[in-house]
C-alpha cells in the first residue's frame, strides 16, 4: 500500500515543517507530539540544535490524572509556557507536526498563549 496512514502522516508533517521553516527562519519552534497515551511539547532552537524547554504528560510533577485528554494538554501547554519564561523565551512559532490543529493540540497551543508565550 503506497499511501498508508503512516506515509500520508509523514508527508503532511514534512509539508507543514517546510512551510514553517521558510516563513520563520531563525525563530524558536514549539514542537508538539501526540501519541495514543501522552502528549508532549518542546521548545527547540533549530539554529543551535538545542532543546530549551520541554513538558510532557509523562512527568509526575504535572499531576495529570488522565494522560491523554484535553485537560492534560492544557496542563502541558501551561507548563511549557512557564518553562519558556524561565529560559527567557517570549516568542516561538507553533509546529503542529502533521497533527490536526484541533482538540488536544489546539488546547495545548491555547494554554501556552494564555501562559504568556507568543505563538
Curated annotation (Swiss-Prot):
GO molecular function, one term: 5S rRNA binding
Record-linked CDD domains: Ribosomal_L18_L5e
GO cellular component: cytosolic large ribosomal subunit
Keyword annotations from UniProtKB, A to Z: Ribonucleoprotein, Ribosomal protein, RNA-binding, rRNA-binding
Keyword Protease: no
Matches recorded under InterPro entries: Ribosomal_uL18_bac-type (IPR004389), Ribosomal_uL18_bac/euk (IPR005484)
Role, per record: This is one of the proteins that bind and probably mediate the attachment of the 5S RNA into the large ribosomal subunit, where it forms part of the central protuberance.
Family: Belongs to the universal ribosomal protein uL18 family.
Subunit description: Part of the 50S ribosomal subunit; part of the 5S rRNA/L5/L18/L25 subcomplex. Contacts the 5S and 23S rRNAs.
The protein's name: Large ribosomal subunit protein uL18
Organism, as annotated: Ruegeria pomeroyi (strain ATCC 700808 / DSM 15171 / DSS-3) (Silicibacter pomeroyi)
Amino acid at each position: 500500500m503506497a499511501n498508508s496512514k503512516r506515509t500520508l502522516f509523514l508527508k503532511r508533517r514534512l509539508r507543514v515543517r517546510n512551510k514553517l521553516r521558510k516563513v520563520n527562519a531563525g525563530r524558536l519552534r514549539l514542537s508538539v507530539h501526540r501519541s495514543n497515551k501522552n502528549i508532549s511539547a518542546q521548545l527547540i532552537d533549530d539554529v543551535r540544535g538545542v532543546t530549551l524547554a520541554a513538558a510532557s504528560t509523562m512527568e509526575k510533577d504535572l499531576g495529570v490524572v488522565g494522560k491523554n485528554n484535553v485537560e492534560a494538554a492544557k496542563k502541558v501547554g501551561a507548563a511549557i509556557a512557564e518553562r519558556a519564561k524561565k529560559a527567557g523565551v517570549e516568542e516561538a512559532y507553533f509546529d503542529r507536526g502533521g497533527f490536526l490543529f484541533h482538540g488536544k493540540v489546539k488546547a495545548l497551543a491555547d494554554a501556552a498563549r494564555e501562559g504568556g508565550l507568543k505563538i
